[in-house]
Amino acid sequence: MVETTNKGYVCQIIGPVLDIEFPGGKLPPIYSAIKIETADGIGNIVEVQQLLGDNKVRAVSMRSTDGLKRGVEAVDLGAPITVPVGVPTLGRIFNVIGEPVDEQGDVVVDQTLPIHRDAPAFTELETKPSIFETGIKVVDLLAPYRRGGKIGLFGGAGVGKTVLIMELINNIAKAHGGVSVFGGVGERTREGNDLYEEMKESGVINSSNFAESKVALVYGQMNEPPGARMRVGLTALTMAEYFRDVNKQDVLLFIDNIFRFTQAGSEVSALLGRMPSAVGYQPTLATEMGALQERITSTTQGSITSIQAVYVPADDLTDPAPATTFAHLDATTVLSRNLAAKGIYPAVDPLDSTSTMLQPGIVSEVHYETAETVKETLQRYKELQDIIAILGIDELSEEDRLVVARARKVERFLSQPFFVAEIFTGSPGKYVSLEETIKGFTMILNGELDDLPEQSFYLVGNIDEAIAKAETLK
C-alpha cells in the first residue's frame, strides 16, 4: 500500500497565519488544505498560501489559532478545502469548510467539490444578454437584472434589504424553479441568526422538510478569523455552481457583504509579507476580486445571478475596495431611506438605481421608452418639490400640476406587497410580470388614469388591482 499521509509540524504562529515544516520533497501545493490537531479534538483546517523554501509553507487558518503551540502535528489532506453540494445542503447553515453549524445533524451528500475552481470556458458561456425577471415592478422596469449578471445592493440599516433579499429568493423558486445560496461574509452573527429565523417564518426554509427549502446558507461572520471570511464567498459560490452545472438550474447567489471579502484579504495580506498597495489594501486586490466574480456567470446549462451588498467605507466611492467591485457590476439597486420613511416598499430609489441592460436592443422599445418617461416624470417632480414646499402646489402651472399628480401615482405604483411580508402586512404578496408592469406605467403616464385617487396605486400588484381598489375607495 502506498503511504499517502504527508505529515509536518507547526514551526511559527503569527496570529491567523502559520508556518509549517514538511519533510524534504513533500511540500503540499498552494491552496492545499492541512489539518492541525487541537486540544479540543475538533482540529483546525488551514490553507497553504505560500511556499517559503527550506521545506516550509505559510498557511492561513480557517479557525482561531488560540491555544495552538509550535511543534503540533500538521497533516496534508492532499486536496483543497472541499464542501458538500446538492439538494441536501438546502435549508442548512454551513461554515467555510462545509460543516453544518445549525445543530440539525450531519449532512449526507453524494459529492463534495473543491472551493478553488476555474471559471467556465468561453465556449460554455451564454453570450446573448437576457433579462432575469424578478416579478418586482421597480426592479424589472427601471434597473433590470441580467441573467447571470452581478448586481450591487446599496442601502443603510432598516431600509428593507433583508426583506428584498427574501422576496427574490421566494420569486426565483416559484417563477424560475431555481434555488438560492446566501453567503454571509463578515457580517454580524445576530443578523445571520435573524435572517435564518425570518426565512423559517416566511417559508423560504422549511424546517420540517429541508429538501423543500429554497436556500442554502453559508456563514463566515465578523468574529471569525480573516481566513474564514476570505474564503466563505468561494464556499457559497461552489455550492451555487453545482446547482447551475449539474442540476442545470437558475441560481441566485447573495453575498453580504462583498466589502468584507476584500477587507479579510487585506488583513491576511500584510501577515503574508506582501507590500501593501493604495490605502493599505492587498496588492492582489483586483486578481482576488476577479477570481471570485468571473465564476459568477451564465452558461448554456444554467445561470448564477449574483446580488452583492456593497458597503462603501466612509461613503467614499473612489476607495479601492468598492471601486474594484463596481468594475464587475451589471446593475445597482439603491435603497432609499426617504422612500422607506414614506412607507413605499420596496424602497428602491428609481432615479439612483442603474442597469446596463436598460438600452434599446436588449429590452423592448416600449420597455425602454416607458422606463425613460417614468424617470423623466419622477425627476421633474423632484425638481418641483422645493417650490411646492415653499409656495404650495397651487402656484404651479397646470402642466406641472399634472406632472406632479402622475409622478405621485407612479411613485405609489412602484410599491408592491411582498409574499415574504404577508405575515407583517396582512396583504397577499404579488408577482407582477414585466408585460403587466409596462402596461400599468404606460396607462398612468398616458393620462388614462388621471381621475383615480393616488391611494389606489399604493401597495397593489398590477394596474387592474389599482383600478379595482379605486372602486372600493369611492
Curated annotation (Swiss-Prot):
What is the protein name for this chain? Answer: ATP synthase subunit beta, chloroplastic
Q: What does the record list as GO biological process? A: proton motive force-driven mitochondrial ATP synthesis
The record's subunit annotation is: F-type ATPases have 2 components, CF(1) - the catalytic core - and CF(0) - the membrane proton channel. CF(1) has five subunits: alpha(3), beta(3), gamma(1), delta(1), epsilon(1). CF(0) has four main subunits: a(1), b(1), b'(1) and c(9-12).
What would be the name of the gene that encodes this protein? atpB
Cellular component terms, GO, for this chain's entry?
Answer: chloroplast thylakoid membrane; mitochondrion; proton-transporting ATP synthase complex
Q: According to its UniProt record, which reaction does this protein catalyse?
A: ATP + H2O + 4 H(+)(in) = ADP + phosphate + 5 H(+)(out)
Q: Which family does it belong to?
A: Belongs to the ATPase alpha/beta chains family.
Where is it chiefly localized?
plastid
Q: Which SUPFAM superfamilies would you find in this protein's record?
A: C-terminal domain of alpha and beta subunits of F1 ATP synthase, N-terminal domain of alpha and beta subunits of F1 ATP synthase, P-loop containing nucleoside triphosphate hydrolases
Provide the alphabetized UniProt keywords: ATP synthesis, ATP-binding, CF(1), Chloroplast, Hydrogen ion transport, Ion transport, Membrane, Nucleotide-binding, Plastid, Thylakoid, Translocase, Transport
**Function recorded in the entry:** Produces ATP from ADP in the presence of a proton gradient across the membrane. The catalytic sites are hosted primarily by the beta subunits.
Q: Which organism is it from?
A: Thalassiosira pseudonana
